[in-house]
Amino acid sequence: MQKQEETLSRLRTIFDIFLRENFSTTNNVYFEKLLTHLQAKENAFVLQAPFVVEWVDRCITAVTEDFKKIHPKVISFMLNLTSFLANNEWMIVRLRELDIVNRAVKLLQREHNLSPSIKLGGIRLMKAITVYSMGLAFLRMHRIWTLLIQYSNNDHTLYVVREARQVLYNMVYKSCDKLHDKAVTLEILSEIMQPIHDNLYKNTDGVERIHVKVDDNEMLHKISSTLDLLSYILQQTLVLEERTTLIILLKEHHDFEITVWKLIDMTHNPYFTEKIFTTLSSYNFALLLHEKLLNPNATEPSEEFTEFGLAFFNLMKFLITRKDGLSFVKLAELNHVLWKKLGPRAPKEIVIQQERVTFENQLICFHMLPLLFSMKYAQKIADEESKIELFDAYVVKLLEISCEQTLRLCYTMRDNFFSADGMAVGLVTAGLANKCIHSLLALENVLDREQAVTVCQALLYVLREAVAMSVITNNGEDDCHSVSSAGSSYLKLYPRGTEQVVNDPQVLHSVMVGLRTLIERFKITWKESVETIGLVNCLAFVLENTSMDARCTVQALKLVQLAVEHFLSPNMALLVDNLQGSALVCLGPIIVKRMHDTMWEVRDTTLELTTSIASISRIKFPAFQRFLIDSKIPPIVYEMAKNDSEVYVRASAFQCLSQMVSINLLWENGLSQLDLVDHLLFVMYRETNDIVRSEAVITLMKIYEHRKIHEKYKNTLFSTLNYCVIGDHHTEVKLNALNFWRREFYRQFSNQGMIDGSFPTVTFSKEQKKIVTLTEKEIQTSIAKVFGEVQQYGYFGILLKCLREETSMEVLEFLIKGVKTMTEKFERYKGIMEEIEMRSPLSDRERPRFDFPSQPQPTPIPQQPPVNPTEADEVIESILNSQDAQLLEKAFETQMQINAQGKTAEKRHIDEFYYKQFAVPLRQFFEELKTIDLDQLVKQHQEWFECKENFTSLLDDILGALKRDDENMISDCY
């Protein structure tokens, strides 16, 4: 209760400051934070405090008297606060008594030059009171929809327009279908439609005629916002579960479809045409849903969509006659989105003119149509029977999924976009092809799998076109990945001119991005699309093009990686022991070449591809192991890890090496001869980049798991690990180093005979080289050996230091989880502590010294005996009188020798006995652990990292900020 009183006291002070006549602030963020806290459930008591409503009353009274008296941010804050109060039914009574809402609405209607934040606050207040029928009646009485239409139509900010449209839709929908007030509904609709009617019709001498004024910018701008508002309202009705009569009112009282169609005569502007057709499409779908699918009195079968289908095809045909390819593709995308909004209410198959079709398939055909025009290469592979059969099968598939009207439109588009002799007239452009692909990718989350496969096949054929075009351009010779071409005869194929589309780098990039997105999203394999079998061949040719830009090269490499991961059948690994005769053979030289590319993005992506190949080669496709060795890739990867100038490339190289070191063939044929361990320890200690150190720890852990590390590195290894846990500032490095320690535990216990977390009754002893029976005493001895070993290397010391000093939440959670597990396991065995102390006692000099110097300690200067003043004078005189010209030269040489010695003295590795300062006995570790509340530690850090601001502290911050603003105002006066 006392805390609430403190909060209210501070808030009352802040509210009083807000109403000062000279109030000004430079920090607007505090208003938003304050509103957020006031809206929270735990602060509901604030809104119930009497002074809050009284402050709102004082504020709106002051604003009514003199608008400029109150700061605009305070007015906006007041309106938002009033909307919070209106959410409480009991507060509505108090608001009515003080006439607050009425005065707020009059303020909004009276003032025209309000700031967007004030308008937004007013709209939110209206939104809050529309929840109540009494509030809706109040807004209706004030004809508030005129203000909302104004906010929706004029040049306002995105937030104002969005909120205004939402409130307006709620008003018109509730008036129509909840209150059944037809008169008010028609009045609102008439107000919305007025800009269209005013500019579309002219009354001359009592005779109504159509007024046509083509491409008047001011008029188009006004009508565009009206069309946007109508489209929003119509599309909102598509998510309703109940039927609304809004659509039939638009149809009967405004002849909506014909009225909007007439706007077409006013413009040749593609942008405005797109707005018109968006509105018409939204209307068609709303009419379909509410007058057919949700109408219980509908007489036609639910699958009969002839009227809807013809309306859709008319829209598409009009855009073809206008030769507007971009709007054509955009309209297909919009219809796809609207169709998906119908959800399960729409049948899977519909009937259009006695023909049963899948509507989404028609949309997909229209999406791909500009791309399909560029498929000429299939005509050149007629001599390859298998390929022409594949393409024929794909064409037949397109014909089967298309209805008659769709095919007619396809031919109409061909005739309009190409001349009679098949020459492109500049309408099928690279920009249009790009839009097709981007439009399809925008529907990635709504496409069915079957449609995604159809699109993927089309993109594969477009990629082949790009390869065929490159053959002609570069006069390439046939090899394992090239295509058969007949030279310039390709360019003469029908239709001519489309080769410029597939030859565009942006189109090629979009095609590869589209393929990768669809294959990843829908897990497409060669079983669904046989065309994917030739994907690597095409990409190999693309990658051999030295003039290819970096973006395309990166996407091609990523697509090759995806093809290797998805399209290699695991069963083939049993039949193939090498890659001879496969297009994959060509990848070796390509990978090596791209590893030396000047662009670091290309080198990095090449390493990702190599990492994937190495991962697959371990089990799934062993033939890749010999592929990597023959191409001499492992040594190149190691050199990149050591010497590449880009940190991301070095990190990727270590990631690649971590996959390679576990493969015996790669280790024995190259990696074992490299100084991997030495360099990794150097990187973990000396590297300045975080991600490189992190990957280096993982790589060293993989080597430690699968290979033997030389005994001379053992002390340095654990010292470096402890340094990474204690001295490194990067969370990932710490976690990887701790994970390394965890793996060391697993390895030690495994060596002692533990299997799946427990000791069996019988095991094979490596020491005695025979099968032995494990007793309780022998198990304790084995555990003692493990704990003695890790105790010696300082594991328990670094745990304690981290628990007391660590600030990273992830590291703490990892540590605490491990400590709790270890404590639970340890309590199962009694007397084990004495066994550990007996087996591995720590000497006094090995006791921990928790000092971690951030800088190396300076070497003390040796004390020299004092120099006699007389001798000093003689030395100075001898130097001054010296004629030795080499004096400075000798001094310079001496300095150079000192610098050289200092440079070589810089150590590559950490002190190998660094670990000893953390060697804590296990008994001391558990005693120290008892003084730490682990759960409280996690809770405390959780509060820090979630940054939960206390409401009272926020109010203190606001008071401090307001005080500083006042001081600044006073200083400005002088």
UniProtKB/Swiss-Prot annotation:
Q: Where in the cell is it found?
A: Cytoplasm, Cytosol
Native species of this protein? Drosophila melanogaster
Protein's GO biological process:
cell population proliferation; DNA damage response; integrator complex assembly
Its biological function? Required for the assembly of the RNA endonuclease module of the integrator complex. Associates with IntS9 and IntS11 in the cytoplasm and blocks the active site of IntS11, thereby inhibiting IntS11 endonuclease activity before formation of the full integrator complex.
Give the record's family classification: Belongs to the BRAT1 family.
Main location, first listed in the record? cytoplasm
InterPro entries according to UniProt: ARM-like, ARM-type_fold, BRAT1
Q: What does the domain comment read?
A: The BRAT1-like motif mediates inhibition of the endonuclease activity of INTS11 by forming hyrogen bond and hydrophobic interactions with the active site of INTS11: Cys-973 coordinates one of the two active site zinc ions of IntS11.
What GO cellular component is one of the record's annotations?
Answer: cytosol
Where are stretches of biased composition, namely Pro residues? 855-868
Q: Describe, as the record does, how this protein assembles with itself and its partners.
A: Interacts with IntS9 and IntS11.
Q: Give the keywords, sorted.
A: Cytoplasm, Metal-binding, Zinc
Q: What is this protein called?
A: Integrator complex assembly factor Brat1
Where do Basic and acidic residues bias regions lie? Answer: 837-850
The UniProt entry annotates the motif BRAT1-like motif at 972-974
- Protease among the record's keywords? no
Residues the entry annotates as binding Zn(2+): 973
Task: Give me the ranges of the annotated region Disordered.
Answer: 837-871
